Amino acid sequence: IERSPAKDRIHRVGYVTNAPELSAACDVFCMPSTKREGLARAIIEAMVYRVPPVVTDTGGSPELVVDGVSGIVVPPKDAQGIANAIEKLYRDDDLRLQMGVAARERIATAFRNEDTVLKTIALYKELVPNPD
């Protein structure tokens, strides 16, 4: 960070109790995972706060983020692709705002808690035979 030309704009905040406010104040969220992960809660939270995510095509990230609609998906270990995606959103306010709205809508419609519970119950019923 100290060698970065943007060091004055990089903030390490440590432990905080106002994470929602900090998340909502961000322009872009970036999760540059290189290996498989599930549905990252940090991505979901960013999307709920209308912060467009830049994620890599690993694990559950592409399931959450519709590339070019609710965020940007780049190949893993593609530092230049990540930088280009962040810069694209940084330079285009309208696109950033549009993707932020689409991100929140995606979480609100495709990943509702109620639907997840119903799908989980249906899966259990399918996997576990009925004793009757």
Q: Which stretches of residues belong to each language-model region?
A:
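Active-site donor-binding acidic/aromatic loop of nucleotide-activated sugar
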Residues: 7-15, 22, 72-73
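Short alpha-helical segment that forms part of, or immediately flanks, the ligand-binding pocket
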Residues: 20, 38-48, 62-63, 69
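Acidic donor-binding loop of glycosyltransferase active sites
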Residues: 24-38, 51
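Short hydrophobic faces within alpha-helices
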Residues: 45-46, 54, 82
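Short hydrophobic beta-strand element within catalytic cores of glycosyltransferases
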Residues: 52-55, 65
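Conserved acidic donor-binding segment of nucleotide-sugar-dependent glycosyltransferases
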Residues: 67-68, 72-79, 88-93
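Conserved donor-nucleotide binding/catalytic region of nucleotide-linked donor-dependent transferases
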Residues: 88-105, 109, 130
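C-terminal alpha-helical cap of glycosyltransferases
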Residues: 113-132
